[in-house]
Curated annotation (Swiss-Prot):
It comes from the Eukaryota. The gene is TCL1. MYB-type transcription factor involved in trichome cell specification. Acts as a negative regulator of trichome patterning and formation by direct binding to the cis-acting regulatory elements of GL1, thus suppressing the expression of GL1. InterPro entries: Homeodomain-like_sf (IPR009057), Myb_TF_plants (IPR015495), SANT/Myb (IPR001005). GO terms for biological process: fruit development; regulation of DNA-templated transcription; regulation of trichome morphogenesis. It is found in: Nucleus. This is MYB-like transcription factor TCL1.
Length: 84
């Protein structure tokens, strides 16, 4: 079993936590985020080093926010989004 599948299973079911005051998420926010190969590689390597500390990863990826990188990771690595 390769590391990608293992990581996918470990973190796929992690869902964002919602509070009572949270707003509805529009479909615009969940459109697939395009990353360059260099950004993808950097995100994957940083994830292996620091885990899901998106703020640390975002500091290394120029022009990307932590929320954007987290959404990209969830959409890229969860089975639900891979079938769409």
């Amino acid at each position: 079993m390769d590391n990608t599948n293992r990581l996918r299973r470990l973190h796929c079911h992690k869902q964002p936590k919602f509070t009572h005051s949270s707003q509805e998420v529009s479909s615009m926010k969940w459109e697939f985020i395009n990353m360059t190969e260099q950004e993808e590689d950097l995100i994957f390597r940083m994830y292996r080093l620091v885990g899901d500390r998106w703020d640390l990863i975002a500091r290394r990826v120029v022009g990307r926010e932590a929320k954007e990188i987290e959404r990209y990771w969830i959409m890229r690595n969860c089975d639900y989004f891979s079938h769409k």
